[in-house]
Design a protein with these regions (language model features):
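Non-transmembrane "mature" sequence context
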Residues: 1-167
Length: 167
């Protein structure tokens, strides 16, 4: 299992580097450190802005999707499209999501990335996402991920958990 996770991480890191090179060529934005990782990607807000504007390819999305707890129905709902549209997009060669959808993909990837770090265990993080939280108005964190403000609340709660603040 650890070998599979390591392979996923290596694939994602490579995909991020390829994607960032494309973003640099298209937008003119230049990175000093070309050896960027998936984790580093979310720390560079200016890079994220340029990446969102370029859009996410379906191939890159597929790699991100493997790292998240969300199924096709969840993703379709988050992206504001039908599951059938998501499947059709998968079949299209060189499909690129619109910037608004790309932003949502990166937001959810960021939450998942932090959640997996905080909980050290994907199953614990996924369980937390689906349990009502007093700190989040007795809503499930998963329910709040549908919009940006909710996502910020979930990230805030994850940071608090990471710091040992359980209020």
């Amino acid at each position: 299992m650890e070998a599979i996770k390591l392979n996923q991480t290596v694939q994602l890191d490579k995909a991020v580097r390829v994607y960032v090179n494309k973003v640099e060529k298209e937008s003119g934005y230049k990175l000093i450190n070309k050896n960027i990782t998936y984790n580093d990607f979310f720390k560079n807000r200016m890079l994220l802005v340029h990446a969102i504007r370029e859009g996410v390819s379906f191939d890159f999305f597929s790699l991100i999707k493997e790292k998240t707890p969300f199924n096709d129905e969840d993703w379709a709902s988050f992206l504001g499209i039908s599951t059938k549209s998501l499947q059709r997009n998968k079949a299209k060669e060189s499909f690129v999501f619109k910037p608004i959808q790309s932003e949502k993909i990166f937001e959810l990837a960021e939450v998942t990335n932090l959640g997996n770090e905080v909980f050290d265990d994907e199953n614990s993080f996924y369980s937390w996402l689906n349990m009502p939280s007093f700190a989040l108005g007795n809503l499930k964190p998963m329910e709040l991920l549908k919009d940006s403000y909710g996502k910020e609340m979930v990230l805030g709660e994850l940071y608090k958990i990471d710091q040992g603040i359980f209020i």
